[in-house]
Structures are given as C-alpha cells and as structure tokens.
Amino acid sequence: QASIFSRFFRMFSFIFPFVNVIKLIIASVTSLVCLAFSCVALGGSAVALIVSTPLFIMFSPILVPATIATTLLASGLMAGTTLGLTGIGLIMGLVRTAGGVSLLQSPLRKIIVNRIKARLGGGGGGSRLARLKKILGLLNKLRGMGAGGAAAPAAEPAPAAEAAPAAEAAPAAAPAAAPAAAP
C-alpha cells in the first residue's frame, strides 16, 4: 500500500520543476537586492566615516554625538558586509544547484547528518526502554560525582570500640543541656 504522501507526490510531481524555477528566480533577485543594499550601505558608511573623522578631531568636545555617529557608521558597515555575504552565499548556492548538486545530494549534508546521529547515539534506533536505561545510567553516573567531578569517597565505618563511649556520653549530656523552667 502506498502512503498518502507518496500518492500526493506522484500526483503533483509535474509541479516540482516549476517550484525549482521559482526558487531560482527568488534566490537570484534576492541576491541582487542584497548585493545592491550592501554596496549602498558600505559606500555610504565609508564616505560618512571619511568625512566625519576630521570633524570629530576638530570638534572633540562633542564626544557623545561623535560616539553615536561612530556607532551608527560601524553598524552600517556591518549591515553592508552582512548583506554582501548573504548575496554572495545565495549566488554560490545558485551556482551549486545549476551544477547539479542539490542540498539533498550534498556531501556536506551527509557529514552533518552523521554528526547529529553520532551525538544522539545512533540516530533514534532502539526501544524506549533502552533509551530510558541509558538516561538513568547517565544520571546515576552524574549523581556519584563529587564537587570536583571526581568520584565521591566511600564512607568508612567507625570502629565499635570508639562508638560505645560516645553513645554512653550523649544521654548524660542531654539532660544537663535542657534549660530549667522559671517559676
């Protein structure tokens, strides 16, 4: 029996090439817009920084506005750089997709999936009871650790000869420590 998803994908499989074309158009337009904004932001920030530097030196008593302006210029430079890197990344993704390497077939994806599976302990295999036992074992291991991460020292039993005098002295000291009631 075919699942509902496989029937759906077989029924609408003619749409997938159109979706790829739409993704290509959106990614190319987005990359061009990001690159254009990055050029404007980087150019404007660089010109403003070049113009404002001598003004900051000449009018040094105005430190608060100078700090604000410098912060804005630095954030403009960062925004331009980020937009530029985003645009370049989109273009590289388009080139990779045009070369026939999709994300599903990418060797980088396989590496990432294998790392995730290794960290999760096999990728979800096994029964719930086995996973519960593994978690409880880890908790017991953590509970047995001392403050410095070392195993907790085992408590040594007190010798019977030393424990007997202490047990006899304790009841005699208890009545003497009780406060007397005032009349």
Swiss-Prot record:
Residues 24-95 are annotated as: Hydrophobic. Its main location: other. It is a multi-pass membrane protein. It is found in: Lipid droplet; Membrane. The chain crosses the membrane at residues 24-44, 46-66, 72-92. GO terms for biological process: post-embryonic development; reproductive structure development. Residues 1-23 are annotated as: Polar. GO terms for cellular component: membrane; monolayer-surrounded lipid storage body. Many of the major pollen coat proteins are derived from endoproteolytic cleavage of oleosin-like proteins. Belongs to the oleosin family. This is Oleosin-B2.
